[in-house]
Amino acid sequence: MTLASPGSTLPNSRAECVALDRADPLRSLRDEFIVPEDVVYLDGNSLGALPQRTAARLAEVASREWGEGLIRSWNSAGWIDLPQRIGDKIAALIGAGAGEVSVADSTSLNVFKTLSAAVALQRIDTPARKIILSERGNFPTDLYIAESVAAASGMELRLADGHRITEAFTDEVAVLLLTHVNYRSGRMHDMAATTGAAHAAGALVVWDLAHSAGALPVDLGGADADFAVGCGYKYLNGGPGAPAFVWAHPRHTARMDRDAMRQPLSGWLGHAAPFEFAPSYRPAAGIARFVCGTPPVLAMAALECGLDVFAAAEPLGGIAALRAKSVALGDFFIELVEGRCAGLGLELVSPRDAAVRGSQASFAHVDGWRVMQALIARGVVGDFRAGEPRPEGAPRDPALDGDLLRFGFTPLYTRFVDAWDAAEQLRDVLASEAFRDERYGRRAKVT
C-alpha cells in the first residue's frame, strides 16, 4: 500500500522502512541499548531505554568501588568529582563550556535554585520588577516552583500564551521561566530570539531543557542564555529518577563569586571547602555552588553510561545527525498517522513544521487514555497526558485542554519500522474501537 504523499521521499511500505533502517548510518547505536524485540518503544521523551553497559557498570560500582573500596572510593574512584565530570559530558550537548554544568539533585530543585538566583540578581539591579513570566501549559513542576519563588520573594507569577511569549514582556517582568520544548505539544521555542527579546526588555531567562537535551542541538552560549536546567532520564537515558543538571552563564557565576552570593539551597557540597566542616556557609566558586547534597553515586554512574552513548554517536555526525533522523522520523509518523487514521478522531497538536517541533508527535483524542492503553497492550508504548480544565468562556485549545497521545522519537534507537508499526496499530485500535474494552478505562497512578 502506498501511503506517502506525492513527491514524498519517505518510505511507502514496511519493506522500505526495513531497508531504510539497514542503510541508516546511525543503526549501530541501537545496539547500545536493550529494547525488547516485541516492543515498539516511543516513550523516550518520558523515560529513555536502558543502555547495554549500565547494568554491568552499576554492578562494578556496587561490588568493586563500594564493596571493596568502601569509603575510600570517594577519593580513589573519584566519586566526589562526579557532579563536575558528568556535567562536562552534558555541557558538550547543550552548548556550554567545560566547568559550567553541575549534575545535582532533581529538575524541580534546580528550577528553584536558578529561578531564585535570577530573581535575586534582578532585585539588586531592577527592584521595581515584580513579575515572573512563564507560558500556559508549561510543565507543572516549573509552575509550582515558580509559585513558591514568587510567594517567597514578593513577586507575582504571570502566564502568557506560549506562541506570543515575547509580546508579554513589560518593564515589570524580572525573569522568564520557559521550557525549550513544550512537554505536551512538542512545540520548540527559538532560544536565541526569545532570550534576545527578554534581554532587550530587561529580563533574565531560565530555560528548562528536559525535552531537548540529547534530542536536538542546544546552544546555551550562542543564545546568551542566563540559566538552564534539565533532567537525566529522558533523552539522556540515565534511568528512572536520574540526577538533573544545572547551568549558569559564566557572567552570573562570576558576579555571584565576586559578591559571595548564595543560591537558596546552600547544602554542604556547595560549600567552598565542605570537609573543613565550617559552621558558616561559604559558597563554592562557579557552578559548584549550585550543588546541594551528596552525589547519588549509583544513579550518577547510570547517567554517565547514557551520556557515553553520545560519544559513540560523535563520529557518525553527533547531535546534528541525531536531529536530522529525529525530524525524518517525526515527519514520517505524522504523515502515516494522518493518512491511515483520517476520520478516526485524532487531531495533530504538535507543529507540522519540524523547525519548531521537538522530538515528539502529539495527537489529541477524546478517549486518549483508553487508546494509549490499548496500544500498550499491543506492544506500542507511548504515553498519555490529560488536558487541563478549560476556564469558562475560553476558546478550545487542544495543546492545553486536549487529552493527548504522545509519541517520542529517540534517534539513538528508534527505527522507521517502529514508526510504521506504531501507525498501523494505532489505526487498528481506532478503527476496531478496541480501546472501548472496559479494561482500558482504569486509570493508573502513572500515565
PLM segments and residue spans:
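Pyridoxal 5′-phosphate
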Residues: 1-447
